[in-house]
């Protein structure tokens, strides 16, 4: 009985973040099929079979996405894209300027706390 989704610095899909990490490590993206095969064989998981971006298209519950615009690990554009594709009528995107990965609450604690608190209150107690 999930009533809402809140994600801080979420990536859009395993495939997208793996390819980004390969590039960041100066490894050829052509290695992706090998990484995928390793995930399938050893983790029993296919990175191409799932993604938050496509799952959110069918989402009908409240969604809060938070991201620092200076995140160098998970690009902020991934949250922007998930927000754009999200099918929920109750969706919110908080972008925190100058915040790195997982640091939005440190950079703008008051705004972060208010946004998350309001979301939780609204989601858990929709009648007011």
Which residues fall in each region the model found?
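Short, well-ordered secondary-structure micro-motifs
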Residues: 17-18, 76-77, 106
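Catalytic active-site module of serine/aspartate enzymes centered on a nucleophile-bearing elbow/loop
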Residues: 106-128
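Acidic catalytic loop of the alpha/beta-hydrolase fold
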Residues: 69-74, 102-103
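Catalytic histidine neighborhood in serine/cysteine hydrolases
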Residues: 80-104, 109, 115
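Hydrolase active-site cap/lid region
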Residues: 1-46, 54, 61
């Amino acid at each position: 009985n999930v009533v809402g989704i809140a994600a801080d610095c979420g990536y859009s899909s395993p495939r997208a973040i793996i390819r980004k990490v390969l590039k960041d490590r100066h490894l050829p993206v052509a290695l992706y099929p090998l990484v995928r095969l390793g995930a399938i064989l050893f983790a029993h998981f296919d990175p191409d079979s799932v993604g938050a971006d496509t799952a959110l298209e069918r989402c009908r519950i409240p969604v809060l996405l938070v991201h620092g615009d200076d995140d160098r690990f998970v690009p902020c554009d991934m949250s922007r894209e998930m927000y754009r594709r999200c099918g929920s009528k109750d969706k919110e995107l908080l972008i925190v300027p100058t915040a790195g990965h997982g640091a939005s609450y440190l950079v703008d604690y008051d705004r972060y706390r208010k946004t998350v608190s309001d979301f939780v209150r609204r989601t858990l107690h929709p009648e007011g």
